[in-house]
């Protein structure tokens, strides 16, 4: 359900763009993201930091787009958000004791430390590449191409990358025999 709530503002943005223009779509994105945030809070009583950062960037860059009537701001939003995510992941990997990926998934998954590092680095590079591709598409191709890329391209490639990471994680999960041996050795 949470993923659906995160996806709704994107659908609203796309529909508003197709029916009206980038400026109405930017305003609709701000409103839909705010509503999604409120619904998430009401349902879960918790909002992830990434969600808050995304909301702040949507409000800032969406508002700048509307105030200055310039679509460059909303186009930069994607690159800046992805850049912030990449930097946060890299800082967690090289400065902190635990990677952000491990902090987010470590309670649900048991993986060797090098696997956490590789996953974290892979996501950082993924966000960096997506941000750079966004710059190219946003500034050298027509606006309609950028909107389709933002809605369908980034969503599709993110789902694909998530699946690839899922397969990678699955390969490194402890098997049932290892789990039962660990449980036996932990018992007095």
Swiss-Prot record:
Signal peptide: none annotated. It holds the Pfam family IspA. Keywords: Cell inner membrane, Cell membrane, Membrane, Transmembrane, Transmembrane helix. It is found in: Cell inner membrane. It is a multi-pass membrane protein. InterPro entries: YciB. Its main location: membrane. It comes from the Bacteria. The chain crosses the membrane at residues 22-42, 50-70, 72-92, 121-141, 149-169. GO terms for cellular component: plasma membrane. Disulfide bonds: none annotated. Belongs to the YciB family. Plays a role in cell envelope biogenesis, maintenance of cell envelope integrity and membrane homeostasis. PANTHER family: INNER MEMBRANE-SPANNING PROTEIN YCIB, INTRACELLULAR SEPTATION PROTEIN A-RELATED. NCBIfam families: ispZ, PRK00259.1-2, PRK00259.1-3, PRK00259.1-4. This is Inner membrane-spanning protein YciB. It comes from Pectobacterium atrosepticum (strain SCRI 1043 / ATCC BAA-672). The gene is yciB.
